[in-house]
Amino acid sequence: MAKKAAEKSAKELSEMLLNPRKNGFFKVTDEKIEKADKFCEGYKAFLNSAKTERESVEYAVAAAEKHGFVPFDPKHKYAAGDKVYYNNRGKAICLAIMGKEGCKNGVRIAAAHIDNPRLDLKPIPLYESTEMAYLKTHYYGGIKKYQWTAIPLAMHGVVVKSDGTVIKVCIGEEAGDPQFTITDILPHLGQDQATKPLGTAFTGEDLNILIGSRPVRDEEAKDAYKLNIMRLLNEKYGIVEADLISAEIEFVPAFKAVDIGFDRSLVGAYGHDDRVCAYPALEAILNCKNPVQTVVTVLTDKEETGSDGNTGLNSEYMRYFIADLAQAEGEEPRHVLSKSTCISADVTAAYDPHYASVYEAQNSTYINGGLGIAKYTGARGKGGTSDANAEFVAKIRRTFDDAGVLWQIGELGKVDQGGGGTVACYMANRNIET
């Protein structure tokens, strides 16, 4: 007969009643670590080849088609095991595998975002000043402006000519490519700059990208440096300056993903937020076999700027996709949505001892603690968040524990310190358990 609580030692009581934080490394075998490291090699390849939302969708479509997915046809009636994808304007994508029970008991959704903080070009970006050519930018998402100066930048995106011709651009990623940069003041002249608060030392209007310093070979030419850049772009891409008006050009760090540390235990790269979730969400559905309920992975755009716009999850494209799945089976879409569940897959902050003042240690997530769960995000008094119901949190706990998943729970830093949002609220607003 089990001993009553009063008869147990303090150690036994502690093991039975308390929830101490443990280092998950010692719960994982060397074999599993080796598998995780192998998985991360694929992740690093994804980070290097898909630095923008358009490139991420191209990657997802190619991978999906290799795994038997086909473009979704809302007029077609699908059977269990069928695999489909919906490409939303080349900037967001929904993938689904039909379950044995179809949609009648709801669908199971994993949602992540594939846009990143970056520097977008202004509509009229090209100019010259003091014998140098530059591009004017408008930053996208939450950035620390000082981090974008004096680093190598690569140019990604599309230029759409007035006749509708789409020209893809990617410069700065391949060996031998030129790269670009935003200049900073050299330390010898930086005394005044150093006295400014970090948030005001660089402004958005300062983030102009240096792209050249040679003129066309004509001493009488007007705008000779700007003209030389357009000459080069015209020779390579057949575009003129006016075509930049209808372009989506993004400048991103040109760094490649690398291992961090002597033990290679971490990955350093641009775009972890949210590719560290988007890649596993994609891999999960690509390798899903015979689901009971229909499963859906959503890789969405515009999260970094509030999820508005027709490729963000505050629009209707995901709801329309699930509605089409439901109606094809004779189900009422709103009933399917209300029975559905979603994991909003986004990043949280691991405790950093060098910046301990912004964390509340007891409610932080830690390196080697496992997958991070956040019941809510938002800011201050939980503003702008979906606060997951306790019943759903319990279901997630049970699911992970039953599958042997190493996990932890925490908040995104101290209350009133800052905060962050994600797509969870837009899923929950459609009555999806999130």
Question: What are the residue ranges of the model-derived segments?
Answer:
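N-terminal hydrophobic/helix-forming segments and targeting peptides
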Residues: 1-434
